[in-house]
Each structure stands twice: as structure tokens, then as C-alpha cells.
């Protein structure tokens, strides 16, 4: 099983060829357009997006999940309430009736409170009693280095909440690295080599993490013409 997450920085319909080369079973794509409302399309995009789920408000920038046409995916339910608003953006789904995921693109939210990782914190807080087998994957817009900016719901708190129910970061476990000390950036602010950050993640139950076959972080020189992010690709043995 191979899963890829990538913030495409918009215009995903024009970036299908390099993404398709990853040959993943599931793609989690942030900042992508709603495939059902794309007016100018190509055959390769139509084929790639034939089996998808998408959430968002702006038809040009949302959160999409794409899989092979023969695969089965369906949305599942999580409590995404935050007062009178909704948490943004999280897409819980089930793959082939056997794997549960939560795709993520941590956003500013609507209230001005608990932005980015704070949105993820409240998702965990709302649902933690039922989150022990899910795979969380996506752009959290967060890193431990920014913990000092928050009095509640920081990055380290979220990592700890997940670890307490047996869910761990694949990158950090497989590469034997510490949070906040990542050697491989996933994001280059303003596409600047000198502003690298690790803000994209996969968290999974430890028994799945231990079955990791490969964990790859894309090279910026290969992706800088397409986005300020690089793909994070996880392959694991499903048996």
C-alpha cells in the first residue's frame, strides 16, 4: 500500500503527470480544485480524478482524496464542530472497507482562534475517544519549533495526544528523528531554499508504522516548478 500527500499550490489539473509517476494507491492533495467543477480539463486529469472525494468552500482550493477507479472510498463521520463554526479542513474516509484515514489541510479557520494546528488540536479533542486506528495524513502547517506561539493546542500537545492512543509519526519513527529536528523539509516558504520547514505528516497506529517499507520526501529541485511543497510518500506492508 502506497499513500502520498502533497500540497499542490493550486492548479492541480496541470500537474498530474509528475504526481502520477509516484504510482500511489491513494493521493491526498491540498489546495486542489474541485474536480466536479473543472471546466477546462484534459484526458489525463479526467482519468486521474475519476474516483475522488473533495471538500472545500473555494472551488479552486480545497482538500481532495484521489484513488484508482477500481478502488472503493467513502466519507466517514467525525465531530468537526468548533462552536458555531466548522474545523478546516479535514476529510475522514474509509478505503476498501478496511482502512480508516483522516486527510488534513490545517487551515486558519473561521473564528481567528486556534488557527492551523489549533484546528487539528480541536479535531483530536472532539474525537480522541474514537481515534485509535485512523491514519492521519496531510499538511498540518505546523512544527514543534513554533510551540512557543501557543498557550493551548500546540504541535507537541497534538503529538502527545496521538501517542497516548498508540498513533505515531511515520517519518520520525522510521527515520529515528525528533520532532522539530527534521532533516528533510516538506515546505519551502516562498519557494526559497533558505526557508525550509517540515510541516507535512503521516501519523498511524504503531503496528502499521512498524510495517513501513519506504518513507520518501520529495526533492525540492524536482518539485519547485509545481509547488512550494514536496510530496511525502509512505509505503507499508498491509498484511
What role is predicted for each listed range?
Residues 1-44, 49-63, 237-239:
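N-terminal, active-site-proximal structural segment of metallo-dependent hydrolase catalytic domains
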Residues 8, 32, 106, 140, ...:
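Active-site metal-binding loops of divalent metal-dependent hydrolases
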Residues 12-14, 35-38, 109-111, 143-147, ...:
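Short catalytic/ligand-binding loop motif for oxyanion handling, primarily in non-cytosolic enzymes
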Residues 26, 118-199:
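Metal-dependent phosphoesterases centered on the DNase I-like endonuclease/exonuclease/phosphatase
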Residues 33-107:
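Structured beta-strand-rich core segments of catalytic domains in phosphoester-bond hydrolases
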Residues 58-75, 95, 182, 188-212, ...:
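Conserved beta strand-loop-helix elements of the APE1-like EEP
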Residues 101-111, 152, 160-164:
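Active-site-proximal loop/helix segment associated with metal-binding centers of metalloenzymes
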Residues 225-239:
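Surface polyanion/phosphate-binding segment centered on an Asp-His-Pro turn
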Amino acid at each position: 500500500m502506497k499513500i502520498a500527500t502533497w500540497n499542490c499550490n493550486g492548479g492541480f489539473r496541470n500537474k498530474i503527470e509528475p504526481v502520477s509517476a509516484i504510482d500511489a494507491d491513494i493521493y491526498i492533495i491540498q489546495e486542489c480544485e474541485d474536480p466536479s467543477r473543472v471546466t477546462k480539463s484534459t484526458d489525463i486529469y479526467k482519468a486521474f480524478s475519476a474516483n475522488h472525494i473533495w471538500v472545500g468552500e473555494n472551488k479552486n482550493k480545497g482538500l481532495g482524496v484521489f484513488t484508482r477507479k477500481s478502488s472503493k472510498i467513502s466519507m466517514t463521520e467525525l465531530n468537526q464542530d468548533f462552536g458555531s463554526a466548522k474545523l478546516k479542513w479535514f476529510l475522514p474516509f474509509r478505503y476498501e472497507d478496511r482502512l480508516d484515514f483522516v486527510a488534513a489541510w490545517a487551515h486558519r479557520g473561521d473564528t481567528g482562534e486556534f488557527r492551523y494546528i489549533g484546528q487539528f488540536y480541536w479535531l483530536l479533542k472532539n474525537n480522541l475517544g474514537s481515534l485509535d486506528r485512523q491514519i492521519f495524513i496531510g499538511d498540518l502547517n505546523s512544527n514543534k519549533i513554533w510551540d512557543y506561539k501557543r498557550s493551548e493546542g500546540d504541535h507537541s500537545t497534538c503529538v502527545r495526544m496521538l501517542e497516548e492512543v498508540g498513533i505515531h509519526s511515520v517519518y520520525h519513527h522510521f527515520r529515528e528523528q525528533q520532532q522539530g529536528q527534521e532533516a528533510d523539509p516538506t515546505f519551502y516558504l516562498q519557494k526559497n531554499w533558505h526557508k525550509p520547514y517540515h510541516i507535512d505528516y503521516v501519523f498511524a497506529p504503531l503496528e502499521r508504522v512498524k510495517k513501513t517499507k519506504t518513507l520518501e520526501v520529495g526533492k525540492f529541485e524536482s518539485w519547485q516548478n509545481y509547488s512550494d511543497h514536496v510530496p511525502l510518500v509512505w509505503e507499508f506492508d498491509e498484511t
